[in-house]
Design a protein with these regions (language model features):
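C-terminal motif of bacterial Sec signal peptides marking the signal peptidase cleavage site
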Residues: 1-5
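N-terminal hydrophobic targeting segments that direct proteins to the cell envelope
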Residues: 7-15
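Early exported N-terminus immediately downstream of N-terminal targeting peptides
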Residues: 15-71
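Extracytoplasmic/secreted envelope proteins and their assembly/folding machinery
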Residues: 17, 21-24, 98, 108, ...
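Sec-exported extracytoplasmic/periplasmic mature domains
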Residues: 29-32, 106, 116-120, 170
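Short, compositionally biased low-complexity segments enriched in polar/charged residues
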Residues: 46-96, 110-111, 138-140
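A short, solvent-exposed beta-edge/loop patch
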Residues: 90-91, 100-102, 133-171
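Short Gly/Thr-rich strand-loop-strand
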Residues: 108-147
Length: 171
């Protein structure tokens, strides 16, 4: 009985952990999956990524790129989250960012503030530069969903992508 109980509690906890990378992948367009990698933090504390151009990197290079380029864009500090998956465009001519963040205890507002700051910086950089990209940034959404995650969607068709993510998180 002890083995069965420990086995079932193990599977219950793994069932509770959601695959944020897969949820983002399924919520967005095929084109975004082709061009924009989705990154997260691996068990070993290094950043990993799938999709987009992630296959072009060696593991350490990829982890460094995410740590030095992508995470500062999002404004997420290590102590702010328990888990996350995100995808942002590093191109200055394209507004693109999606993220699912499971905040650390007591850090929900910090995560919301970081996501809001990302969206505001995208709006500001595009306001007098590329009107179509400014419209995308202006339609961005940051919200804490009923399951507790903070979701940021700053991309084309943001309402649909947001609803797809919200539904998948609730499943």
């Amino acid at each position: 009985v002890g083995c069965g109980a420990s086995g079932s509690s193990g599977s219950a906890s793994s069932a509770a952990k959601k695959d944020y990378t897969q949820i983002l992948h399924d919520a967005r367009s095929d084109e975004d999956n082709e061009y924009e990698m989705i990154f997260t933090k691996g068990e070993d504390g290094k950043f990993t990524a799938q999709y987009g151009y992630s296959a072009e990197y060696e593991a350490d290079q990829l982890s460094d790129e995410v740590a030095n380029m992508m995470m500062p864009l999002l404004g997420l500090e290590d102590d702010m989250y328990d888990d996350f998956a995100a995808s942002v465009s590093g191109m200055m001519v394209r507004v693109y960012g999606v993220a699912i963040v499971k905040p650390a205890e007591g850090k929900t507002q910090d995560v919301v503030d970081a996501m809001d700051a990302y969206v505001q910086s995208q709006q500001k950089s595009m306001e007098h530069y590329l009107e179509d990209q400014y419209q995308i940034a202006s339609a961005a959404r940051v919200a804490t969903v009923p399951t507790g995650e903070v979701v940021m969607v700053c991309c084309e068709d943001s309402d649909t992508v947001f609803e797809n993510i919200k539904k998948a998180l609730a499943a």
